[in-house]
Every structure is written in structure tokens, then in C-alpha cells.
Amino acid sequence: MFKGVLLLAFAASSLNLGAAVLTPEQALARVNSQAPMKLKGKALTSYKLSYTAVEDGQNAVYVFSQPADGKGYLVLSADDCADAVLGYSDSGNFDAQNMPEPMVWWLGEYARQIAAARNSNVLKAVERPERKPIEPMLKTTWNQDAPYNMMCPLINGQRSMTGCVATAMAQIVNYHQWPVQGVGSYQYFYNNSWISLDYSKITFDWANMLDSYADGAGNERQKTAVAQLMYACGVSVDMQYSPAESGAADLFVASGLVDHFNYDVNVRYAERDYFGLLDWEEFIYNQLTEYGPVQYSGSSSIGGHSFVCDGYSEDGYFHIN
């Protein structure tokens, strides 16, 4: 199982000159010279290889974890065409046998980017500007199952998941503790029936939303408070509900916030394809400093995920909740 938060370089395409497949030992050795601030001085010999992502028949990404106390893991490039440390957690744990879909997707995307870099004739080092660090803003560690999905539709007797888009959106709305009451109403047709919600009758119970509902935490009122918010977010983005996984497009989040949560009309949806790497990082950084947590998503031919970016470390890693 994956728990905790992860700090990530936004792209494996922050490339260095050269391209050579590395053994796990070589990949770990690179960390000594390129370690993020929080990892400097740590005994890396305590980290053990837990997972290898393979792309085009070659190792692309290694995950090393702390077997002793289960706290902390490293996501390393298996090729010197990319930064040594792609991401890390100094508190979470990593179980390769029980990885959630978001983690599977992240590692797969890094592997595909590194494989693409190997096949590219243009390898260029990226020089990032110095920026002030931003401490992680979210306190919540919410998920998609119970109690968060208590109000989601039942399909064949099974409760639907909230969906990652709704879960990310709900955590941001909870961060701002806004609005007190919803706006308007909305309905859409899905799975041979109409899903509808009158937002004007919803009063959000912010005071009773817990930062975590792990291990059965929360009384009935506290569980209902977060479930109501999750469902309100899901309906606003035309969530395609399912007990296995629920899906929606992030591009609907902005209109949902404006139309039913009374957010500013200037809330916007932006795509990475229209920015250069450094311009995109600057754009996200500025959003964090000016407006708070940013909902971020990524997708490929095999799927996608939505999550929250809510901080930035002094050595250039974005904090992902």
C-alpha cells in the first residue's frame, strides 16, 4: 500500500546530457551527488530495491524503500538521461504488491518518458530558476472509498467510488472552506438514469470535516459532511460512477467551481501542451503562491489520474498530496 505524500519533479524530461541504463546500485549511488535537501546526510544503504518499472524491454524506474521502519522511499531514474531522483517520500510507505492506481500510473508515465528520452537525439540539461519554497498547504489525506463515497450512487447493490477528480477537487474546496452554501442545481444522464442535485439546498459542514478518516475515524455527522462534499463535487463534473472506479474530465472542474460553488469566474483550466517545461513550472508555482493548491491531472493511453499539487521544495520538487 502507498500512504503519505510524494514530492515529484514535474517531468522526467528535465534531462541531462548522456543516456545510459543504470543498475539499481548505480542509480542509488547517483543520489549521493544529487540528493534533495531532505535526503542529504541520510544513510542510503538502508534503502532496498522494491520495484522496477520496465519500458521497451529496459529498466526505466527504480523504487527503493526503507524496510526497517517502512517510512520513506525513493523513485529513481534507471537512466542517466534524467534526474537521479524523480520523486521521494520521507514519511510514506511503499508496497509493490498493493500499489493504488495513481501510483501505478505515475511510475508508468515516468518510465514512458525516460524511454522516449532514450530514443531522442536532443538531450538538454534544464536550469531551473531559484524559487522560494512553499510549505505543503493541505492537511487532508482523503480517499475515494468509505466514508467518502457514502452518498455516491449504488450500482448493482455496490457503492460507487467518488472518483479521483472529485476527491482532489473536494480537498481544494475544503482548504478554502468555501462556500457556506451551494449555488443552483445540475443534472446529467448516465447509466440509463438521471443524476441530479440541488446545490442551493446544501450547506457545507466544514467544521465537521476531518483531515483523515483512516482506521474508521469520525462519527456519523463527520462522515456525512465529507460524503456530501464529495458527491457535490462529483456531480458538478459529470462523474461517471462505478463501484470499481469512477471517472471524469478535469476540464469540468473550473465550471463546476464557478457554477455551483460560487468561485471566481476567472478560475481556469490550462493544458501543459501549450507551455514549455520551465514556463509550465513557473505557471504552476505562481498559482500556488497566489491562489493556493492546484488540481493537476495527467493521462495516457492506459488511463490517468487527478491529484493536488500544494507545495514546492527549495530544491525544485513539487509537493503532491
Feature names for model-found ranges:
Residues 4-13:
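Sec-dependent N-terminal signal peptides
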Residues 15-19:
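Sec/Tat signal peptide C-region and signal peptidase I cleavage site
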Residues 20-55:
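Short, non-transmembrane alpha-helical segments in secretory-pathway proteins
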Residues 21-25, 158-163, 167, 247-252, ...:
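Soluble non-cytosolic domains of exported or imported proteins
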Residues 33-38, 79, 167-179, 259-260, ...:
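Structured segments of extracytoplasmic/periplasmic soluble domains
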Residues 49-70, 255, 259-319:
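Active-site-adjacent substructure of cysteine-protease-like catalytic cores
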Residues 77-92, 315-321:
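Catalytic Cys-His active-site segments of thiol-dependent hydrolases/isopeptidases
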Residues 85-246:
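Active-site-adjacent structural segments surrounding the nucleophilic cysteine of cysteine proteases
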